[in-house]
Amino acid sequence: MSTERRASSNPMTNEENAMFLDILHEAPLFGHRKSRSLVGSYLYMLLLAGYAILAAGAPWMFHRVQQLTPSLLCCCDVALLVVTGVFQQYFVYQVQKIRLQGYYSFSQKLKHVVRLPFAIAAYGTAAMLLVIVWRPQIHILSISSLQRIIMLVEAVGAGFFMGLYIGYVHQYNSVNSRPDVLKSLYSPLQPSSSMEGLRYYEGRLSDQQTALLQYQRENLHFLSEEILCLQEKLSKYEQSDDGSTPQVDLAHLLAARDQELRTLSAEMNQLQSELRLARSLIAERDAEVQRVNSTNNQYIEENERLRAILSEWSMRAANLERALEVERMSNSELQKEVASTRRKQMLETTTSEQP
């Protein structure tokens, strides 16, 4: 029966739906949404990195006071707990700012994440206390080793959740959607099934309505400031129009606008002169490039001509080498013939001289 009553109350005209849906386009704070700073998160991450380095290098850092190493590590752990508590208050303040900006889902995600580093530090401090109390009965590892392990686990766990926080805040800074808290204004007015209608009876609806009221209060505060500023300006201009006060503000405003216009015109003239100078320099560079290209073409033609001459002289040298080789061969043949004729003459003279 309750489902039927809800179903009978759901049908609405398009005009009535649009009356509530138009609220999405009437969020003044959306155009003035401020990004959340991550400087504190990065500082806390650097602190955790230094804490992890201290835990890893404690035997070398405290080698001169080894008997005081457990006490010093406990002091460092307590200091981390205190600093984490301070940073947690800062992170909770940032999450509240995100909630007041109308981003309910981001604030719900971050609300649980920002408290986990302090919880991890508190659990680590409790574990450190148990190690100190049960020191006589612990024989597996040394006390300093157990303390260093606890410190490393604290640093890694807190760093992991702080990385999640940084990722969510970075996503919030880069998001460009409307505030999701406004959905609670019109979502119950839309037709829904019986199972979907049950979600409005959860405790989350009251939290969403509270966030919506806070967001609307911020919108009203912002609009009040804008209205006061506009009323102040209007009163100044009305007084100047009545003649009760001179139009000093208007004249000052016009003079300021005139000065800005002159400044802009001077900057524009300077930019135009610089542009003309740049164009002249570009023209000179183009002419120089053309001259270099023409000179390069001449060098290429001269190189081609020299290559042709070199090839011609190479052919001539080859012909001369061949002719020289032929001449050498003919000369060697002549020398052989001369030698043979001399031997014949010597033989003839020797035969003629014999009786």
Swiss-Prot record:
One of its GO terms (cellular component) is membrane. Disruption phenotype: No visible phenotype under normal growth conditions. Residues 220-337 form a coiled coil. Pfam families: TMEM192. It is a multi-pass membrane protein. It is found in: Membrane. Residues 331-355 are annotated as: Disordered. The keyword Transferase does not apply. Residues 331-340 have a biased composition (Basic and acidic residues). Belongs to the TMEM192 family. Interacts with FRI. This is Protein FIP1. It comes from Arabidopsis thaliana.
